[in-house]
Each structure stands twice: as C-alpha cells, then as structure tokens.
C-alpha cells in the first residue's frame, strides 16, 4: 500500500504542477505581464513547484534528509539519468551550445550551496543568500533575452501552457486544482517515503536521494527525451541546467524560509561533492561541443547506477 501511495503522490505532484503552471501563465498574460517575464519567472518556478512542496513538507515534518536529498539527488539524476537515457535514444550534437553562461552560473551556485551547507543548516539567512543569487541569475537571463530582440508574440508561441483562448473560469479552476493538489501530493509522498525508509531500515536521506529524487525528475526526463528526439540539444542541456539552478537556489532558498533544513554529515562528505562533480562533467558538452551519443549515455547511466549502489 505504501508503494501505491508513493505513486499517487508522484502523479498528484506532476498533474497539479501542470495545472498550476497553465493557470498561472494564462492569468499573468491576462493581467498584461510580458511573456518574457512570465517565461523566466512564473514558468520556471511553476515547473519546480512539486520539488518545492516536497521540500517544504519534509522540512516542516522534521525529515530534512528528504528535503535535502530530493534537491541534491535530483541534481545528480538530472545530469546522469536525464541526459543519459535520451542519449541512448538519439545522439545529440551539442556544438554551439547557448548554455555556456548558465552552466557557469550552475557550477558557481553549486559551490555557493556547498559552502552554505557547511554552516550545518539552511535557515533564514542562508535562504536569503540563495534567493539573492537566483535573482541575479534571473536578471542576467532577462537582460540576455531582451538583447536577442525576440518579439513578445514569438515568446508567446513558445511559452509553456500559454493559451490566449482559455476562458477565465478554466484559468481559475487550473489554479485551484494546482494549489490543492500540490500540497496534497507532497504530503502523501513525504509520508509514504518516510514509511518506506522505516520499512527498509534506511535513512530518510537515502530515500530522498534516490526514490524521491528520481520521481521528481521524471518531468525533466520526459522533456529531455522529446528534445533529443527532435535533435534539440540546446533544449536538453538548458532544461537540465535550468532545473539544477532552481533546485539549489529556488527550492532550498524558499523552503528554508519556511522551516530550517538541517544538513546531515553524509551530504558534506560525499553527496554534495558527487553533485558538483557530475555538474562539472557537463563542461565538455557545453564548451567543446562533444556529441552526446549512445556510448556517453551508457557511461552516464553506469555512473548513476554506481552512485545509487554506494548509497544502499
């Protein structure tokens, strides 16, 4: 029954998260907010809403291992699993990637995150530091986007969930379903994951780093698989880099304002360094244009399997 509840929690998070994004995007556009701002803020935060609610729920329930494990584990899974699986399906030519600056931000933010973790917990001031760093990244991205002179109509066509014809009652319904479903799904998932940890005699940290992290990374995996099939390497890399940025700064930043998140010793001695290492592993693909094909897919998945084995 616990596994069924875990699946229910994941499904609720994904579906409710999609409802929230669609509702928030279309409401913002109705209010006259430019598509560029909606894309860089509301969509970015909205697609990370499942991870955010899981982190907040875990922190308030005193299971910080799940909160931290979800974020750190998701960042590891995003590189090794979310890039590894699509690479088996279709070779991605990463030459001329537009993700170089975002990659540098991601690595820099990872170093900042590790430094803050050595304070022993993520509380109010650590959360504010992370959110300030995220604001700088968003500001830089917005400046770059404006320099590209892309019209608002073009942005609207590419904007996830945008539907100018959507009636107001549907917009409000999507918002309501998202706001109800997200905390409900997070509550079910955290409770079920904690129960699984107790049943198997493992720590909530291990469950957060594996089961919860993989589950909350499934939407990114689906998006990246589609990008690989369409030969959109930039979309695949940008999806992973953007998700990792928001996981570190947005999710832990906001969650730590709600409740302190303690950092278990194993994060400081192992998992955070694995996260940084696999992030740096993306450098040849981003800067040198290495082709991400089947051989590299096998290597990435083997590394991920090895990492999971070391946790068990």
Model feature map: region roles:
Residues 1-312:
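Hydrophobic alpha-helical segments, chiefly the membrane-spanning helices
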């Amino acid at each position: 029954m616990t596994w069924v509840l875990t699946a229910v929690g994941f499904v609720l998070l994904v579906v409710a998260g999609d409802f929230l994004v669609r509702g928030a995007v279309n409401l913002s556009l109705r209010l006259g907010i430019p598509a560029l701002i909606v894309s860089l803020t509301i969509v970015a935060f909205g697609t990370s809403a499942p991870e955010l609610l899981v982190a907040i729920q875990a922190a308030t329930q005193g299971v910080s291992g799940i909160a931290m494990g979800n974020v750190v584990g998701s960042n590891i899974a995003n590189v090794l699993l979310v890039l590894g699986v699509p690479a088996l399906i279709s070779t991605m030519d990463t030459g001329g990637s537009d993700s170089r600056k975002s990659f540098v931000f991601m690595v820099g933010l990872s170093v900042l995150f590790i430094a803050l973790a050595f304070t022993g917990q993520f509380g109010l001031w650590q959360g504010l530091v992370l959110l300030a760093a995220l604001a700088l990244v968003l500001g830089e991205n917005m400046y770059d986007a404006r320099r590209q002179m892309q019209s608002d109509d073009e942005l609207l066509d590419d904007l996830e969930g945008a539907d100018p014809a959507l009636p107001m009652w549907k917009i409000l319904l999507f918002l309501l379903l998202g706001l109800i479903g997200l905390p409900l799904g997070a509550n079910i998932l955290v409770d079920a994951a904690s129960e699984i940890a107790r049943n198997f005699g493992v720590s909530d940290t291990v469950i957060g780093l594996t089961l919860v992290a993989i589950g909350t990374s499934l939407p990114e995996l689906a998006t990246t698989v589609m990008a690989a099939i369409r030969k959109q390497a930039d979309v695949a890399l940008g999806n992973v880099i953007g998700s990792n940025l928001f996981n570190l700064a947005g999710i832990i930043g906001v969650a730590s304002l709600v409740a302190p998140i303690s950092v278990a010793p194993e994060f400081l001695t192992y998992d955070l360094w694995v996260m940084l290492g696999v992030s740096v592993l993306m450098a040849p693909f981003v800067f040198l244009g290495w082709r991400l094909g089947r051989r590299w897919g096998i290597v990435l998945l083997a590394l991920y399997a090895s990492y999971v084995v070391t946790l068990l």
